């Protein structure tokens, strides 16, 4: 998961947050300077400020909103890369402690009783207001199940997910083989990804219920509004701001619950059967795993529609919007790189080889698509979810780093990701989208049988130099399913559709836009699609 400002990517009414941010700066500037104690270790320098200063000037705050990429790059090169911590501005009037790369291994080795991921995101997401309780990020067993159970049944989910992708693309890209259709990419892909993700979360037919899907996005957007606006407020005002800005999420939660309830009641009845009963066909989705787990471990939650629905919403929050933005960037990058790298033809050739046996998708088959893998990985490298990663909260008193820095209890910190992934000392020509950057290296490392090497260079691998999924034991457990989803998605699109930029783009990918520390594809980016008369 990414920093708070990343949530801007899904907020439709930018003037709202801009107005609120301006108001925050005016109303709370003196409060933060004179009344709010620093939440970072004393003595850590503030980027672009004189030594010893403990607050950011209006000039530096303004740079965060108007030129954050260069501000954070400056902080990375001057401090983080050299093994030194630094404090940078955050959303609202936040102070963000950035740990140096040299401490990443130490942080990853700390127990959850000392440094917590869950507590960090509980602070950031403020679900106490948007979902009515802290349990959904305080006791995240709905996410733990992805790691402990869902990934082990991934092979059983792949066929249904593939079928749903076909249905969704046929509906939204169309089936006209004669005429080009211009689509607004993000708007269309939000619907496709929501439907596909819901197939493995709650199954069919609820995954095709437009009212249910729209309400889920309403909750997600409301959650992000709450996180941004509430965190931009002083703590004494948060109990007032939180409920006010959470009305959208709460109202949409009620719609989700209403649409979800018939399936919920139906699934409770299935629990009367043993899942291994040969006369009973166990549903294969996240919801069923969740309910089976609750029977044994969360009996107090099992029959509570409100709690189970909101745990499903939490899963949707993690599985929908970031995947959508990645696929938007990926399709734009493929088209933008096609003239130089012949990207589409190379991918279609690999897809044809992979699917020519006519057999269904399997995890093993998807793993052989190293060029498609490279295209996805390069998108995540050059267009990460946010500028920072590995959000953590200190929950142990007296924690001291190996270099002697005392970390205050309840302080938050993170690591740079975007500057690392664009570091010329780590990547050749780092700002260039090179679709086959990693596949060339993996093919060069192939063994005598021609099997590719470089398994540390796959989409789902993590390292200090590649952080879209986080790193270490808390790396995103859903990345294996998302990996399969994106490869099947891309195969279906390129096998069944011709795609191109609108004429006015002149063959050029529209440039990334920056909202504070978040790089996004331009609002309203479009492509043209036409169904192929014959699939490859």
Curated annotation (Swiss-Prot):
Report residues binding heme. 476
Provide the residues annotated with a glycan attachment (glycosylation). Answer: 125, 321, 387
Q: Pfam family of this protein, just one? A: p450
Q: Where in the cell is it found?
A: Membrane
This chain's function reads: NADH-dependent flavin oxidoreductase; part of the gene cluster that mediates the biosynthesis of ilicicolin H, a 4-hydroxy-2-pyridonealkaloid that has potent and broad antifungal activities by inhibiting the mitochondrial respiration chain. IccA to iccE are sufficient for ilicicolin H biosynthesis and the roles of the remaining enzymes, iccF, iccG and iccH within the pathway have still to be determined.
Sequence similarity = Belongs to the cytochrome P450 family.
The name this protein carries in UniProt is Cytochrome P450 monooxygenase iccF
Species? Talaromyces variabilis
Lineage runs: Eukaryota, Fungi, Dikarya, Ascomycota, Pezizomycotina
Gene from which this protein is expressed: iccF
């Amino acid at each position: 998961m990414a920093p708070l400002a990343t949530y801007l990517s899904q907020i439709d009414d930018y003037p709202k947050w801009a107005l609120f941010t301006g108001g925050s700066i005016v109303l709370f500037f003196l409060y933060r300077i004179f009344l709010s104690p620093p939440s970072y270790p004393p003595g850590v320098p503030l980027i672009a400020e004189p030594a010893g200063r403990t607050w950011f000037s209006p000039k530096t705050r303004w740079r965060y909103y108007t030129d954050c990429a260069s501000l954070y790059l400056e902080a990375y090169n001057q401090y983080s890369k050299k093994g030194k911590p630094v404090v940078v501005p955050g959303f609202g009037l936040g102070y963000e402690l950035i740990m140096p790369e040299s401490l990443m291994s130490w942080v990853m080795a700390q127990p959850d009783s000392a440094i917590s991921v869950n507590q960090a995101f509980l602070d950031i997401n403020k679900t106490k207001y948007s979902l009515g309780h802290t349990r959904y990020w305080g006791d995240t067993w709905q996410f733990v199940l992805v790691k402990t159970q869902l990934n082990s049944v991934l092979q059983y989910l792949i066929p249904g997910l593939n079928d749903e992708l076909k249905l969704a693309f046929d509906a939204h890209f169309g089936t006209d083989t004669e005429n080009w259709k211009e689509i607004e990419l993000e708007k269309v892909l939000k619907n496709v990804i929501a439907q596909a993700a819901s197939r493995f979360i709650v199954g069919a037919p609820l995954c095709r219920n437009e009212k249910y899907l729209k309400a889920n996005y309403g909750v997600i957007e409301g959650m992000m509004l709450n996180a941004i606006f509430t965190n931009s407020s002083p703590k004494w005002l948060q109990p007032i701001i939180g409920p006010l800005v959470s009305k959208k999420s709460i109202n949409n939660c009620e719609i989700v619950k209403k649409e979800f309830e018939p399936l919920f009641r139906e699934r409770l009845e299935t629990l009367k059967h043993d899942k291994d009963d040969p006369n009973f066909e166990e549903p294969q989705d996240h919801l069923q795993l969740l309910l089976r787990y609750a029977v044994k471990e969360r009996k107090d939650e099992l029959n509570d529609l409100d709690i189970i629905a909101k745990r499903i919403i939490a899963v949707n929050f993690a599985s929908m919007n970031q995947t959508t933005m990645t696929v938007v960037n990926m399709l734009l990058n493929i088209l933008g790189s096609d003239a130089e790298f012949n990207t589409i033809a190379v991918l279609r050739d690999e897809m044809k080889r992979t699917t020519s046996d006519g057999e269904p998708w399997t995890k093993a088959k998807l793993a052989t698509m190293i060029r498609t893998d490279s295209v996805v990985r390069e998108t995540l490298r050059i267009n990460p979810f946010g500028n920072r990663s590995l959000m953590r909260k200190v929950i142990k008193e007296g924690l001291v780093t190996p270099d002697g820095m005392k970390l205050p209890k309840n302080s938050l910190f993170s690591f740079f990701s975007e500057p690392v992934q664009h570091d010329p000392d780590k990547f050749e020509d780092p700002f260039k989208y090179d679709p086959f950057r990693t596949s060339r290296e993996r093919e060069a490392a192939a063994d005598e049988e021609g099997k590719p090497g470089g398994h540390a260079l796959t989409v789902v691998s993590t390292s200090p130099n590649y952080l879209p999924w986080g790193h270490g034991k808390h790396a995103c457990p859903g990345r294996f399913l998302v990996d399969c989803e994106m490869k099947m998605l891309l195969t279906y699109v390129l096998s069944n559709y011709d795609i191109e930029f609108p004429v006015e783009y002149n063959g050029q990918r529209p440039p990334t836009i920056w909202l504070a520390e978040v790089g996004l594809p331009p609002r309203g980016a479009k492509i043209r699609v036409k169904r192929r008369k014959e699939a490859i």
